[in-house]
């Protein structure tokens, strides 16, 4: 039912590219700009021996939207998509606190916890290959799909507010993650 509602609200609305495949135009890092680059049509977030954190934020802010992207990583990665603020994130990779993969699960930074866990991710996630993620954010409702299968249906108790989208390089982790085909459809 929730996927039908999301599809109905997208009729006639074209997605907008968040990344041109060549530059970081439209994005700004919170810190450590050297952690962010473009390589082979992808945004690359890569930490160094300092293992400091950085978030690459869109310059534009969004209310309700559908975010679509592809991501790829190998090894230990603790990353994700920040949605409208730094308190709500959809995880990619190993949770630092839980020490296991929590890809597609929401993390609430202000509360320091995962309120729910995405289902079926282990069977869908392809480590070292490109994975497709789609996150619908409408009011307090989050719906997530991984490689075409719905894995998350979550309602937050946080008040929604307009804000940017962020890509994360988590502190205290030596990691590299690639993002491409980033697009957003305002709802």
Predicted regions span which residues?
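Carbohydrate-interacting regions of secretory-pathway proteins
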Residues: 10-187
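Bacterial N-terminal signal peptides
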Residues: 1-7
